[in-house]
Regions:
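Flavin (primarily FAD) binding-site architecture
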Residues: 145
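Catalytic core of DAGKc-family lipid kinases
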Residues: 1-142
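ATP/nucleoside-binding phosphotransfer catalytic cores, i.e., glycine-rich phosphate-binding loops
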Residues: 127-129, 148-270
């Protein structure tokens, strides 16, 4: 139970507090305290992030591409006030919108639910390769003030799966329309350039750029890594990242807020 209590206090340190919003429905210390007093315990799925050689960290959500580059730019301007820093990074990254070339390998959830041997499952990996504006991997709904339905409304706290959300390369105008949908009750995935999958494992392998954008490889080589947004924390990694969900790995104080009434908010930065 000491481990559980530690995570309760940790949830309020992130930028968007997605875990606090998902567990309590609101970012409110008194509400969280009441859940502890009343003994509300909720099992939660957790992801591991690793390379072929080492474990990187644990987490609940990840973004590669736009979401990660926005955070990386914001971290370089920590001298700015928090709200201004986030708006500046968002607008600057959106103005310089570029796709990431990478290969995604994933194991669909239904494959592991079939009565097959583990060795057969290795042949069931699916792959997609291309240029993506953003790749999101979410083990929980990821509710927050800017996304009342959640960044991944089709997943749950403890159903043993992850939502893989792939945004293909498209125009800036269409991408903004997709982002604005998160702030409403409309389906943010109802676009031809957005693909969603329910998975148990994902491998993300960045590819070096070719053609006119090849000069960006020099900058990436100098930095030695690609940015990742893990629960609002910046992580940099140069090699393939393997994300795996571990069903109901930990117990946290809180409840399942899946049945909360949907609400609408407005976004001041779009």
């Amino acid at each position: 139970m000491v481990f559980t209590a530690f995570f309760f206090f940790f949830t309020f340190t992130g930028t968007t507090n997605i875990l606090a919003h998902t567990l309590y429905g609101i970012k409110h210390a008194v509400t969280a305290t009441l859940h502890i007093v009343m003994g509300h315990i909720q099992a939660v799925d957790v992801c591991t992030f690793s390379t072929p050689s080492k474990l990187l960290r644990f987490g609940f959500s990840a973004m590669f591409g736009f979401g990660a580059r926005t955070l990386a730019l914001a971290e370089k301007h920590r001298w700015m006030p928090s709200s201004q820093r986030k708006d500046f990074a968002f607008i600057k990254t959106l103005a310089d919108l570029k796709p990431e070339e990478c290969e995604l390998s994933f194991l669909p959830l239904q494959i592991l639910q079939e009565d097959t041997h583990e060795k057969d499952g290795k042949d069931q990996w699916q792959k997609i390769q291309g240029h993506f504006l953003n790749v999101s991997i979410m083990a929980i709904p990821c509710l927050c003030s800017m996304a009342p339905r959640g960044l991944a409304p089709n997943t749950r706290l403890n159903n043993g799966s992850m939502a893989l959300i792939v945004v293909q390369n498209t125009s800036r105008t269409e991408f903004i329309k997709h982002l604005k949908r998160y702030t409403t009750a409309k389906n943010q995935f109802n676009f031809p350039f957005v693909e969603t999958y329910t998975v148990r494992e994902v491998k993300v392998q960045p590819r070096l750029k070719s053609g006119p954008d090849a000069q960006e490889n020099v900058c990436l080589s100098a930095e030695g890594s690609y940015p990742w947004n893990i629960d609002g924390d910046l992580m940099k990694e140069a090699s393939e990242v393997h994300v795996r969900v571990h069903p109901q790995l930990i117990d946290l104080y809180g409840v399942n807020t899946d049945d909360l009434e949907s609400s609408q908010v407005t976004c001041s930065c779009i």
